[in-house]
C-alpha cells in the first residue's frame, strides 16, 4: 500500500472454510467488503476456484484500513492459500490490481514498492507482468511476473 508516496507493507490474512448454512458468511476487516466479494467472484469464474459454498473471512493485520487496488492480488493469493490449505512462499510480497476478466493490472510506483520490500528482507515479489519492463533488475529479490489470476493460483 502507498501512503502518499511512502510504501507501507501490510499483512493480509484469509480464512476460507465450508459453510454450515445455506448462505455463506463473508466478512472483511480492513478491506472493502464489496471488493472482496468481487475478487471471490473473479476467482470462481476465471480461475475455477469454487468459493460459492464457503465462508470467507479477510483481515488486514494490525487493524489498518486499506482501500488500494494494489492489494487485490494479495487478497486473491490469501484466499486461495486458505482454500487449498497450502501456505504461500515464505518472504514474499504481492501486489497488483485484479480486473473482472481475471487480468492482473499494473499499479503505480512498483519500483518503490520493490525497494521497500528489499529493505525489509523479502526474497520474492509477485507482481503484474506489465510492471516488469519498468523495474530495475536486481539479484536481491526474485521477481515473478503474472498476467492473470489463473497464473497466480498456480503459484500456490
Regions found by a protein language model. Give the residues of each.
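Peripheral, non-AAA+ core regions of ATP-driven protein-machinery
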Residues: 1-156
